[in-house]
Amino acid sequence: MLDGALYLCSFGFLYLLKLDELKPEFIEKPLKMLKNGLKYLKENRLIVHLIFLHAFVGITAYDALIALLADYKYANLLSTSLVIGLLNASRSISLMFAPALLSKFMNKKTLIYIYIGQGLGIIIWALSLRNFYLSLIGIIFAGFCTSSLWSYTYTLLQQNCQKEFYGRVIAYNDMIFLGFSALISFAIGFLYELGLSVEMIAAFMGSLFFVGAFYYHVVSKRYEIR
């Protein structure tokens, strides 16, 4: 009921919003827009690299891993819904407050350390998974760099994209990001079916950010990022 009421309120505000003065500057046919957008990506490889650098944040879509923890590893401690809720609540603490601490240090030179920090945070969480209450602390480390990494890589993409292609590039970016997140969720289930422990899966996910750090180092040396 509450969700429905919120949707009705939002539609009401949207209906009352006056957008008469906003007119599109660039009008193209859909197929031509798609063709020109893909051509723009082909001619601007930096944009493609920034899209994939942002997609690394999709590794943090470990909801499937949390579900496995709740259903199997911590099943005898608390109810599934309570385990999932507590883990997500603990993670949200760092997602909310860490950006305020890291924003003073975020720039193109320090971004590589944010990738490394994200990887180390997930590995710390992996080491704490043997104990549920320790994992509530460990997941705070896992989420400490996530918001800053997501927002800064998104900002880099915006700053290095031409205005007329901005909407298309953001659409491609979201498509790659969501696809990467779905792939990670599938990989978690697949690795678990192969017999890997949740600790090993989490540690593997953290190590992927070291690949992201190296990838960013190569891109920053090869291209001039604004």
Stretch-by-stretch model annotation:
Residues 1-20, 82-85, 89-90, 94, ...:
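Hydrophobic alpha-helical transmembrane segments
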